């Protein structure tokens, strides 16, 4: 289990649990699931959906596809962003998405 000290003041423990193909509405993509704890007693899932169309749009501009490792890294950066921005994440079960609105910014954080 890994730890992340968030800007909200909470220290989260988390680990990668599962990756699977998924759909959100009319969009297809990949869902990354992390198991997270705030108190080291209760563990809850946090899901990050990486939109396939956003990845394709990026690929068209960059001339190459995102690797599986890069996509995983983007999902993890979105998880950290949620930790930093959302207080009480355990109760809110946010809909975390990587799409055209945030993919480039997340990749920039990774120097990609």
Task: Report the location of each language-model feature.
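Generic preference for hydrophobic/aromatic residues in regular secondary structure cores
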Residues: 16-17, 48, 79
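Amphipathic alpha-helical interaction modules
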Residues: 33-63
């Amino acid at each position: 289990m890994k730890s992340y000290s968030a800007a909200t003041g909470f220290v989260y423990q988390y680990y990668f649990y599962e990756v699977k193909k998924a759909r959100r509405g009319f969009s297809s993509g990949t869902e990354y699931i992390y198991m997270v704890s705030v108190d080291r007693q209760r563990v809850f899932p946090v899901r990050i959906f990486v939109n396939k169309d956003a990845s394709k749009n990026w690929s068209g501009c960059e001339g190459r596809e995102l690797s599986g490792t890069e996509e995983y890294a983007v999902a993890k950066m979105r998880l950290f962003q949620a930790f930093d921005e959302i207080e009480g994440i355990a109760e809110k079960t946010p809909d975390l998405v990587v799409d055209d609105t945030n993919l480039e910014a997340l990749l920039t954080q990774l120097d990609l």
